[in-house]
UniProtKB/Swiss-Prot annotation:
Record keyword Iron present: no
GO cellular component: plasma membrane
Keyword Ribonucleoprotein appears in the UniProt entry: no
Alphabetically ordered keywords of this record: Cell membrane, Membrane, Transmembrane, Transmembrane helix
Transmembrane segments annotated in the record for this chain: 7-29, 33-55, 68-85, 90-108, 115-137, 152-174, 204-225, 245-267, 280-302, 347-366
Membrane topology classification: Multi-pass membrane protein
This protein's name: Uncharacterized protein aq_267
Record's subcellular location: Cell membrane
UniProt superkingdom: Bacteria
Amino acid sequence: MFYVSKVTPFFFALALLNLLISLFIRLSQDTSLFFVSLVFGFVGLTLMGAMYQIIPNSQNRKLSIPKVSYLVFFLILVSFYEFYTGNTESGSLFLFLGSLIFFFHLLLNVKNFYPLTVRFLLASMIYLVLSALFLYLHFKGFLPVQLSVHTLTVGSMLNAIYGVELAWIPMLIMETLNIRKGEKLFTAKQVSTLALLLAFWSMNYKLIALAGLLEFGVALYFLYLNYELFKRKRMPTPPPNVVKIFLFALLFLPLGMLLGIFSASHAQALPFSLRLHLDLILYGFGAFTIFGGMLHLLPRIVWNWKVQEKENPGFTMGDLVNERELQTFLEYSALLYALFLAVDSLFSPLHVISTVVYLVIMALFLKEIHKAFLYIFK
């Protein structure tokens, strides 16, 4: 790694705390706070932390004025303190200010806009700021919460995941992406995202369903590009376990999108279809992609951090993450996630048991990642 972001692990830790909190808030009737904790607190903060690491390295340069990243983290901490103490309007304002500073801080560090992944991440950053602005306007009573949520998930999360996985998966399986097709995906993604967000701005559910079909088509094209990579794969060895986690997560992307389209066009299926849509997209696709990303990124950040401090840090990368145990984590998590979906489909109050099931998944993940966090302080 050319640059090591020392603030990234703290963004990741706060993101995981928000994921934990979301599992309990989902049992309440506070829909807005649930979206704040899961979408903005878990997904959004993971994206911010990851981009503080990925973007400077994509430019082969150190982050300028790194203390600004700590200011951003402080503002984010304040925002979630405000959210969880009932001050949603001030919390969303601090979140927007932190996101805005984050955007300009990283933008000033981008000199080469040509790489495909960089452009995906820049689009993700733009939508991240817009989602925070829309959330603030929601709490002021001007915009629906659905617009802010989908600006982050469809706009920021998917752009970031598409861009990063189109770089990481070919690298990890030693294949080459067809750049021309990747460029087509980028263009189509920006068109489909804009169409879907305009539909949510209008809150016309027929338009949302139609625009959702366009977004679904783009997702299928992304899946096709990944299929092509594995079809051309010359090496007979199985992919790394982190890639297996990414692939497992991808199973839930088209399913979750179809449930979202179905929910928009069949109001009578609510709220069951909407809850399953959230389970598939956020607790399934989003969470397992993030789990894989953290398991790949965090140990490398910590190891390089300690190597920069002293040539022999006294531990190896294998001490931070055990590749063999990742296979076990994936196998148990897959079974538990299937149980989570099944139990969450039950009538109230039995569906509450699903929270316990997902807590076990989180415990298994923390068992794999906790050493990387602990070695920060050694």
